[in-house]
């Protein structure tokens, strides 16, 4: 099964990892207060101490030229299976939404916080998608809240925006 590994750090530190590993497909983005790098691979990662996920559904290819929204979806052991089944079975007609580029549904190797990456041409296209029924019915906090379990046992549902780095 394909894995996705992520690490956060300073731009310079993560960029050096990327430069030193030209044979690995490493993707680096800017977030609001940090940089993030990730590697999607069937093999071993070059990242040291990354967060590891199983890729359980994928559409499209990653690109450093696209805008991404990473959605963190908390669950509990009691609700994780149902959450996963719901998200796997979602009709993926959102792929036809203007500016859509890619999608990844990720199962955590440790813990119960799932992650979704939505890739769009730019943030404006993603914000348009967020207003759609497809997003509100399947991916919004309200749509997924009954899979969170009781409060206090998990992290919060949140989004992190990842921007292309312009050099």
UniProtKB/Swiss-Prot annotation:
Keyword set includes Repeat: no
Domain of life the protein comes from: Bacteria
Residue span, ABM domain: 67-158
One cellular component (GO) term of this entry: membrane
Matching SUPFAM superfamilies: Dimeric alpha+beta barrel
Main location: membrane
PROSITE patterns in the cross-refs: ABM (PS51725)
Coiled coil segments of this chain: none
Keyword field: Membrane, Phosphoprotein, Virulence
Modified residues (Phosphohistidine): 66, 79, 154
PTM annotation: Each of the three conserved histidine residues contributes to TRAP phosphorylation. Phosphorylation is essential for TRAP activity.
Subcellular location: Membrane
Family (UniProt): Belongs to the TRAP family.
Function: Signal transduction protein, which is a major regulator of staphylococcal pathogenesis. Phosphorylated TRAP leads to the activation of agr system and consequent RNAIII synthesis resulting in the expression of several virulence factors. Up-regulates the expression of most toxins and genes known to be necessary for biofilm formation.
The name this protein goes by in its record: Signal transduction protein TRAP
Organism in which the protein naturally occurs: Staphylococcus aureus (strain MSSA476)
Gene it is expressed from: traP
